[in-house]
């Protein structure tokens, strides 16, 4: 996480870390690691988080604001993506979409969108989850997530996107239906290859 690097720079320069700075750095650590749940969490990450807590990071208010509070718009969008949910026959791939019209009508903030993909990813048995958002009439952003073995960075890279092994994104010229039809076969082929290798 970038906040780890910032913390090291501050320490190397001997600069004081106030409670406000500690709180800001803790926010970065927490959000970059999915509240310390992603596989990018190292023992160093946890040590720095503990040090930031000791330096006055307000973890209680952060917990409430980041993880235990939802706007009405976010709940509306969550309902929408669940109504549009698709799950593959083998249960390993799930996807949903938010149309450009819905995005235009609701005018969501970025915080209303953050974490929606996890609603799909957290379904039991799902390995790869994608949320398609119509950001323009013929422009779609796809957020890709995986749980255990799938490299979604590889999938996103096939279409000019990128990111991390467990979290990546890509922009597609076309509406959400087109984007879903484009990425779906690639996802299903990755799953097919993995399942075939597991059977050997």
Features from the language model and the residues they span:
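Hydrophobic helix-and-loop "lid/oligomerization" segment in the mid-to-C-terminal part
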Residues: 31-200
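Short alpha-helices
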Residues: 1-48
């Amino acid at each position: 996480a970038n906040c780890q690097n910032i913390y090291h720079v501050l320490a190397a320069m001997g600069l004081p870390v106030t409670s406000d700075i500690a709180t800001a750095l803790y926010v970065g650590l927490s959000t970059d690691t999915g509240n310390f749940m992603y596989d990018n969490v190292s023992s160093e990450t946890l040590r720095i988080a503990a040090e930031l807590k000791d330096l006055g990071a307000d973890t209680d208010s952060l917990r409430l604001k980041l993880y235990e509070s939802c706007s009405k718009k976010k709940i509306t969008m969550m309902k929408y993506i669940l109504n549009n949910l698709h799950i593959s026959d083998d249960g390993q791939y799930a996807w949903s979409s938010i149309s450009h019209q819905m995005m235009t009508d609701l005018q969501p903030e970025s915080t209303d969108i953050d974490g929606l993909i996890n609603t799909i990813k957290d379904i039991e048995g799902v390995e790869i989850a994608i949320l398609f958002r119509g950001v323009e009439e013929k422009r779609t952003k796809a957020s890709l997530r995986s749980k255990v073995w799938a490299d979604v960075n590889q999938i996103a890279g096939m279409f000019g996107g990128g990111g991390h092994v467990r979290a990546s994104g890509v922009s597609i010229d076309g509406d959400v239906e087109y984007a879903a039809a484009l990425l779906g076969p690639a996802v299903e082929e990755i799953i097919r290859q993995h399942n075939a290798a597991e059977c050997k």
